[in-house]
Amino acid sequence: GIVFKEPEIDLSKMKEWKNNIIGGLTGGLSGLAKQRGVDVIHGTAKFSSKNEIEVNHESDSRRISSDQFIIAVGSEPAELSFLPDDPRIIDSTGALEPDQIPSDILIIGGGIIGLEMATIYSALGSEVTIVELTKQLMPETDPDLVRPLERILNKKCKKIMKSSQVISAIASDEGISVSFKKDDEEFSEIFQNVL
């Protein structure tokens, strides 16, 4: 007979796969820009006129003139001042480099990135709770588009709390104790990780 073992997730192979995908996408965009004759310049820029920008990068500063500019600003994870400094509190960058899969995770924010992370961690086996300040997930999106996604997430996630606010978080040996406020009610829960 044949005996199959319980499937396991190899986090190091998963990270390697993710890094290969990111490297391919980044390299592909750089190659496409070069192929189209686009000069890619890194730094902090500001327009000095409609056809000129001043770019600062490290100790270098220069002015560039052009009829057209493509501004690719990228993004940085938001830092929430009420969260304690604790390695179990991660941002979206750290969430893609896990050392272990948490048994449960609170995701603060029901925007696109938060929902991507909820889907990933749910698929990895974590119990996922999402908290969103507004009455709708992905608040800037047409509600008719959000409803089908929310139905799927309700099946995959432990809990989705909308119109709810995180008011504090305290790190302890047990986990991260997070206090919430919904309407006039306050309550707390403990999570292994918070994103």
Label the model's feature ranges.
Residues 1, 35-37, 125, 156-157:
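Glycine-centered loop/turn motif at secondary-structure junctions
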Residues 4, 46, 75-77, 112-117:
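Short, flexible micro-motifs
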Residues 1-17:
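Glycine-rich active-site loop/strand segments that organize a redox cofactor
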Residues 4, 40, 159-160:
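Residue-level detector of short coil/turn "hinge" positions at structural boundaries
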Residues 5, 34, 71, 122, ...:
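Short polybasic/polar patches that bind polyanions
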Residues 1-4, 90-91, 120-123:
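Short hydrophobic/aromatic-rich motifs at helix boundaries and adjacent loops
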Residues 16, 20-30, 96-97, 102-106, ...:
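Rossmann-like dinucleotide-binding cores of NAD(P)H-dependent redox enzymes
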Residues 23-108, 165, 179-195:
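FAD-binding core/adjacent interface of flavoenzyme oxidoreductases
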